[in-house]
Amino acid sequence: DVVRFLNERYGMHMDAASTAADKRRIYLEMLEKEGMQPIREVVEFVHSLGDAPKAIATGSAMPGASRTLAAAGLSGLFDVILTPDEVEHGKPAPDMFLKAAELLGASPDRCVVFEDAEPGMKAAAAAGMDCVQVRRPSLS
């Protein structure tokens, strides 16, 4: 959607697939070189949930999602990891959250979404799920 917007708005001619691949590659290179600083409170909270069913519904492709979770010390703590490749419509459509609930065997009205971006908050509302906004310190 971003590539289409830029192409239309500024008369650019970027290919969406190759631009997305470049973005993923650059992100993984940066993660490898610079690491990441997870939000400590989020990491502590996820650990505090213990065996409660948990899912990640991320806009990232699986390689980036897996590496990010590992860098944050969260590998193996989620029962389900969903990426946009696994649903017909990504956020802000509710598809990812509804599929996550289904895979967890949970009713959407019993799920809570923790989200840091507006499209995800809209997706949670459309899925009929409660949503808690997570503010990223670097963007607050």
Locations of regions flagged by a protein language model:
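Short, acidic loop-to-helix structural element flanking the phosphoryl-transfer center
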Residues: 29-56, 62, 66
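Hydrophobic alpha-helical core bundles mediating ligand binding, dimerization, or RNAP-core interactions
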Residues: 2-3, 20-27, 64-69
